[in-house]
């Protein structure tokens, strides 16, 4: 009895393991993890800042454009905080365009609720005119409020 082998059949050759092209290996091993970390950081960093910073504010920063009073467990605040965080990051070298953030959920900052009669969060307030306020999560309204001069 004679064995017949079909060319290109199921027989595998040892040592001829298929490998991805080198540029694809570099992308998968080096570039993709960096992209994943950057994307994760984009969402994670504001969350960390919202919950663990702004917990013991010594006073209003009168050089800042405005202040945002927020509560870290407030869903409306959670919606708007990342936008304010990245606004501050982009304006890190211009203190007059910063928006100071104060977490009024923290025991150390609860006095701001009474000091400035804060009734809802998030509340935006001009540092130059504490009577000029906005309670909103609408990006356009917030942007317009920030751009108006406090008198």
What are these regions (language model features)?
Residues 120, 125-151:
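Non-catalytic, surface beta->alpha helical segment in thiol-disulfide oxidoreductase systems
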Residues 2-62, 147-151:
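N-terminal leader/targeting and pre-domain segments
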Residues 56, 108-112, 141:
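Short acidic active-site motifs
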Residues 54-94:
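Local sequence-structure signature of Cys/Sec-based thiol-disulfide redox active-site neighborhoods
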Residues 77-78, 109-112, 133-136:
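Extracytoplasmic/secreted cell-surface and envelope-processing proteins
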Residues 69-71, 93-110:
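Thiol-based oxidoreductase modules, predominantly thioredoxin-like and allied folds used
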Residues 81, 85, 113, 139, ...:
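Extracytoplasmic/secreted envelope proteins and their assembly/folding machinery
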């Amino acid at each position: 009895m004679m064995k017949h082998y079909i060319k290109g059949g199921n027989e595998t050759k040892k040592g001829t393991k298929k490998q991805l092209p080198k540029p694809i290996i570099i992308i998968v091993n080096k570039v993709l993890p960096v992209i994943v970390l950057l994307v994760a950081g984009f969402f994670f960093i504001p969350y960390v800042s919202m919950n663990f910073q702004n917990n013991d504010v010594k006073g209003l920063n009168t050089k800042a454009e405005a202040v945002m009073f927020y509560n870290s467990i407030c869903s409306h605040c959670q919606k708007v905080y990342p936008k304010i965080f990245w606004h501050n990051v982009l304006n890190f070298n211009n203190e007059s365009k910063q928006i100071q953030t104060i977490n009024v959920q923290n025991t150390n900052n609860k006095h701001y609720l009474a000091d400035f009669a804060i009734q809802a969060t998030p509340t935006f307030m001009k540092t130059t005119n504490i009577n000029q306020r906005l309670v909103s999560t609408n990006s356009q309204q917030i942007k317009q409020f920030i751009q108006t001069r406090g008198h």
